[in-house]
UniProtKB/Swiss-Prot annotation:
Its cofactor is K(+). This is tRNA modification GTPase MnmE. Binds 1 potassium ion per subunit. Belongs to the TRAFAC class TrmE-Era-EngA-EngB-Septin-like GTPase superfamily. TrmE GTPase family. InterPro entries: G_TrmE (IPR031168), GTP-bd (IPR006073), GTP-bd_TrmE_N (IPR018948), GTPase_MnmE (IPR004520), MnmE_dom2 (IPR027368), MnmE_helical (IPR025867), P-loop_NTPase (IPR027417), Small_GTP-bd (IPR005225). GO terms for biological process: tRNA methylation; tRNA wobble uridine modification. Mg(2+) binds at S235, T256. Disulfide bonds: none annotated. The keyword Electron transport does not apply. NCBIfam families: mnmE_trmE_thdF, PRK05291.1-3, small_GTP. GTP binds at residues 231-236, 250-256, 275-278.
């Protein structure tokens, strides 16, 4: 992000999305927000009350007629003077309004995430809440929305702040024992009690990290891979799951050469299903590449659906992979073996067994995700810093042969790592990465 550290500029951007639209919302934030009202020949409206006005250029020409809202500092999203202009969502209208604002001294178009970054800088939110807002905007399923809302509501911040305060309090006891060991009002040897408290905290953080694996699955989605020999019905199954023709279906073996992926919403959980090249020996260079990609995707899968044509001879061979594998018998309408090898029998021609398979996929996804707690680490950044926190706590607990001064320093570092998650300490180098994930206007 360019030079915005001082926040002397007043920023503006279209916040309401793609044009044309019924209504377009332009957001403004910064010290010259009041000057903007003066420039468009309008009085500043009563705070947080919608006012109808005519938006004008600097020479007095009418641009549009619409609503405006004014939010004076510090009681605004960014903590600065803010305004919203609600105009008709025509492209020419919005472009003219943005051009007028861009001509004003000290005003410029906002960069991606800059409104939220200013809110963070002004203490209106911490980094976990900002990340939760980014996830809320990106959420495509109900489960993702719920998870993002939990984070954006401040549940993570509350938990991490509590843990950090416990570390600070424990460190204070140790330093009190160091500095005032001869004073009568300092309990004798409180350190044993402190180590017990730290051990309990360590176990809490470990449990918290474990819950983050499920949250990551919900945020990033589960991955299901369809494999099998050529003409086993893989593409037909993918088309059924997608509800449209995604893959080409042909009697010619080896039609699918590359990976084809569709995204499903199963009970609010995002599930990515990938169709792969048929697994067989081949002299085709292109087909070999497709088969290698299929094997690579299998290695990353949460679930593998191994398909085999039931109308032919039973010859189930499943490659050794870590993911759970379901054996699916296809083309059930053509008869053939009713072998107990198959977990499910399906026919994309008659629809037999397909709804049962879809229900099973949803049940699998729900079991994988489980019950998401109120506060969970949703990003790898959180987990890395939580693990660093545990490492410092372990050093403090296990350092029986070390001076108390060094063990107190381990506790200080542990609290610092927790502070980095919320942005309370030393996070300048990651701010650009976090806020660049937002769209312009947020």
């Amino acid at each position: 992000m360019s030079e915005i550290g001082s926040y002397h500029d007043t920023i503006f951007a279209l916040s309401s999305g793609r044009l044309p639209s019924g209504v377009a919302v332009i957001r403004i934030s910064g010290p010259k927000t009041r000057f903007v009202y003066e420039t468009i020949r309008q009085a500043i409206p009563e705070p947080r009350h919608a006012a109808l006005l005519t938006f004008r250029s600097r020479n007095g020409d009418a641009i549009d007629r619409g609503l405006t809202l004014f939010f004076p500092a510090p009681h605004s999203f960014t903590g600065e003077d803010c305004a919203e202009f609600h105009l008709h969502g025509g492209k020419a209208v919005v472009e003219k309004m943005l051009a007028v604002l861009g001509e004003l001294p000290g005003c410029r178009i906002a960069e991606a995430g800059e409104f939220t970054r200013r809110a963070f800088a002004n203490g209106k939110m911490d980094l976990t809440i900002a990340e939760g807002l980014a996830d809320l905007i990106a959420a495509e399923t109900e489960g993702q929305r719920r998870l993002a809302m939990q984070v954006a509501s401040g549940n993570q911040r509350k938990l991490y702040s509590e843990w950090r305060q416990r570390l600070i309090n424990a460190r204070a006891f140790i330093e009190a024992e160091l500095d005032f060991a001869d004073e009568s009002d300092v309990p004798g040897s409180v350190s044993m009690q402190v180590w017990q408290q730290l051990s309990a905290l360590k176990h809490e953080i470990e449990h918290h990290i474990a819950s983050g694996k499920r949250a990551a699955m919900l945020r990033d989605g589960l991955h299901v891979v369809i494999v099998g020999a050529p003409n086993a019905g893989k593409s037909s199954l993918l088309n059924f799951l997608a509800g449209r023709d995604v893959a080409i279906i042909s009697e010619e073996a080896g039609t699918t050469r590359d990976l084809l992926e569709v995204k499903l919403d199963l009970g609010g959980i995002p599930v990515y299903v990938t169709d792969t090249a048929g697994l067989r020996e081949t002299d085709s260079v292109v087909e070999k590449i497709g088969i290698e990609r299929a094997r690579a995707r299998m290695a990353e899968a949460d679930l593998v659906l191994s398909l085999e044509d039931m109308s032919g001879p039973v010859s189930v061979t499943v490659e050794k992979i870590e993911a759970e594998t379901w054996l699916i018998g296809t083309k059930a309408d053509l008869g053939g073996s009713a072998s107990g090898l198959w977990k499910y029998h399906i026919s994309t021609m008659t629809g037999s067994g397909l709804e049962q398979l879809l229900d099973a996929l949803q049940a699998f996804a729900e079991a994988k995700i489980g019950q998401i707690e109120d506060a969970v680490p949703t990003r790898q950044r959180h987990i890395n810093l939580l693990r660093a926190t545990i490492e410092e706590i372990e050093k403090a607990i296990e350092g029986d042969d070390l001076p108390l001064e060094l063990r107190a320093e381990n506790m200080r570092l542990a609290s610092q790592f927790l502070g980095r998650i919320t942005g309370d300490v030393d996070v300048e180098e990651i701010l650009d990465v976090i806020f660049s994930q937002f769209c312009i206007g947020k």
